[in-house]
Amino acid sequence: ATAKAAPTEVSSILESKIRGVSDEANLDETGRVLSVGDGIARVFGLNNCQAEELVEFASGVKGMALNLEPGQVGIVLFGSDREVKEGEIVKRTGKIVDVPIGPGMLGRVVDALGNPIDGKGPIEATGYAIAQLKAPGILPRRSVFEPMQTGLKAVDALVPIGRGQRELIIGDRQTGKTAVALDTILNQKRWNDGNDESKKLYCVYVAVGQKRSTVAQLVQTLEQNDAMKYSIVVAATASEAAPLQYLAPFTACAIAEWFRDNGKHALIVYDDLSKQAVAYRQLSLLLRRPPGREAYPGDVFYLHSRLLERAAKMSDANGGGSLTALPVIETQGGDVSAYIPTNVISITDGQIFLEAELFYKGIRPAINVGLSVSRVGSAAQVKAMKQVAGSLKLFLAQYREVAAFAQFGSDLDASTKQTLSRGERLTQLLKQKQYSPQASEEQVPVIYAGVNGFLDNIPIERIPEFEEQFIAYLKANEGDILEAIRTKGELSSELLDKLKSATETFVATF
């Protein structure tokens, strides 16, 4: 039989046993993993943890505390959950998820936490900002009045966008949604190469849940067109963890807000928010939050509204900067009345609706002119464009009305035939090649010629040729008209007469 411990030894044995036990009182700052799986870790401890705080696991993986429940904390992982073991120690970092900001970000590609992924060395940030900041209040804002030119005739003429506006780009897959946003970024080059800071527009592009090849191609396009120097790309691709896809738009928004809050102008493209909603749904269901419509959580509207509300035009007292947002939403089979599309349509100040059918007909950009609107942009439209584009909307609407009849009979009256032929020509006029955005001074004369009937006798297939030669003719002979549109942004009655006679002269020789 084993000898009993003498009473004097008992205390020393107990002491040696107790020394082996970790200090349980320290559960305020650290915790232990209870279970891990599907990118979610449930942790016991971390009593002082804040919501959305960054935490670090012993294995080096980082995570964000989303659910603070009695007895445990639900943490989403920013990396692979294979590294994290049950019983592993987790510690607080004491900071909410923040990202590097400043002009040093320009020309860089970063991940959802703001770490560079382009192999160009560390980022020279001027500071850090919390990713999920609140939007500016009502008083620091002012209404939108400056144009944000996309370089696409169909957009600048019919659904003009102003600086500080939020314009949704919505359509099925492969209808050219990213192309519209990308052309807008490329179009800013003509101002960003100059020295006028008030005209410059810094661009932030967020890729959420896209293929890596697509993002690489996009960065390459920006570099080839020398547009990367004023752009920032934030990438959370399809292979990355859902929490990163959920966070990326907020990260990018914080980066773009630096420009807005320093009296500069920025543009942010969220491509696309459907993927962010899907990632957020995944997180919410794994964290066992109750599902709502289409199994999205109840606060998926708030997810998008708090993000898009951060795009704003600031008042002069607050620096007069602006942040314009172009969120992208992908619909399934043209269904605009699904949950996420209706949510985002109601949050934004208008939408550009792209249709697969138009795209296959060769009308590109495939903008459905009837369903696309801009709720605040007309106040910001270039005046010269407003002068010529007003009747364009009307003609296209009349054309859509009678286009249905056109299939039936040849015995249409003259005015209907006239409406049809002009409508076809205007539709042709609004087509545009990708990566070739046009300045407003090139758009206005062409649209002027279209709406005033100068194209009515030109064969449809020759319209692109007409457009090219007409602009060249004006540049050579009537430079002052183009100069006036570029500098003043409006056409006086003398210049309108001049444009009219120039157009007549050119059409006669064409």
From Swiss-Prot:
GO cellular component, one term: mitochondrial inner membrane
Pfam families linked: ATP-synt_ab, ATP-synt_ab_C, ATP-synt_ab_N
S-S pairs: none
Residues engaged in binding ATP: 171-178
Cellular localization per UniProt: Mitochondrion inner membrane
Membrane topology qualifier: Peripheral membrane protein
Record PROSITE patterns: ATPASE_ALPHA_BETA
Domain of life: Eukaryota
Molecular function GO labels: ADP binding; ATP binding; proton-transporting ATP synthase activity, rotational mechanism
Keyword terms: ATP synthesis, ATP-binding, CF(1), Hydrogen ion transport, Ion transport, Membrane, Mitochondrion, Mitochondrion inner membrane, Nucleotide-binding, Transit peptide, Transport
Entry-linked CDD domains: ATP-synt_F1_alpha_C, ATP-synt_F1_alpha_N, F1-ATPase_alpha_CD
Main location: mitochondrion
Entry similarity comment: Belongs to the ATPase alpha/beta chains family.
HAMAP family: ATP_synth_alpha_bact
Subunit (UniProt): F-type ATP synthases have 2 components, the catalytic core F(1) and the membrane-embedded component F(0), linked together by a central stalk and a peripheral stalk. The central stalk, also called rotor shaft, is often seen as part of F(1). The peripheral stalk is seen as part of F(0). F(0) contains the membrane channel next to the rotor. F-type ATP synthases form dimers but each monomer functions independently in ATP generation.
Function description: Mitochondrial membrane ATP synthase (F(1)F(0) ATP synthase or Complex V) produces ATP from ADP in the presence of a proton gradient across the membrane which is generated by electron transport complexes of the respiratory chain. F-type ATP synthases consist of two structural domains, F(1) - containing the extramembraneous catalytic core, and F(0) - containing the membrane proton channel, linked together by a central stalk and a peripheral stalk.
Full protein name: ATP synthase subunit alpha, mitochondrial
UniProt source species: Pichia angusta
Gene this protein is translated from: ATP1
